[in-house]
Amino acid sequence: MIQEQTMLNVADNSGARRVMCIKVLGGSHRRYAGIGDIIKITIKEAIPRGKVKKGDVLKAVVVRTKKGVRRPDGSVIRFDGNACVILNNNSEQPIGTRIFGPVTRELRNEKFMKIISLAPEVL
């Protein structure tokens, strides 16, 4: 469950290391975002010569949460931290060309096939 002011790790090579959620998109008073949801983020920590810089405001899709996601068979997939993949504000395609760490199959339902194909492992 990601809400405003939540700090997340970045699971791609866009150049950002830590980001902060500033808005959960999809509804006027929506409070929480889970895996596969799009959020508005600001870059809090970035590496030199990256594609993004500190202070940039972009969109991102949540790919891993500590809360996890429940499957229809009753199993729950949880992760050690919250992570997102940074998206282009207009096309909503990933800015990075590599994805680090596993992602869940739930992204397939949300039409993020590019992230699924770049990920090293899909749970």
UniProtKB/Swiss-Prot annotation:
Keyword Flavoprotein: no
Pfam families according to UniProt: Ribosomal_L14
Keyword Ribonucleoprotein: yes
GO biological process: translation
A single GO molecular function term of this UniProt record: large ribosomal subunit rRNA binding
Gene Ontology terms: cellular component: cytosolic large ribosomal subunit
Record-linked InterPro entries: Ribosomal_uL14, Ribosomal_uL14_bac-type, Ribosomal_uL14_CS, Ribosomal_uL14_sf
Organism domain of life: Bacteria
Keyword set, alphabetical order: Ribonucleoprotein, Ribosomal protein, RNA-binding, rRNA-binding
UniProt cross-references to NCBIfam families, sorted A to Z: rplN_bact (TIGR01067)
PANTHER family on file: 50S/60S RIBOSOMAL PROTEIN L14/L23 (PTHR11761), LARGE RIBOSOMAL SUBUNIT PROTEIN UL14M (PTHR11761:SF3)
Subunit structure: Part of the 50S ribosomal subunit. Forms a cluster with proteins L3 and L19. In the 70S ribosome, L14 and L19 interact and together make contacts with the 16S rRNA in bridges B5 and B8.
Biological function: Binds to 23S rRNA. Forms part of two intersubunit bridges in the 70S ribosome.
HAMAP family reported in the protein's UniProt record: Ribosomal_uL14
Annotated family: Belongs to the universal ribosomal protein uL14 family.
Entry protein name: Large ribosomal subunit protein uL14
Species whose genome carries this gene: Yersinia pestis
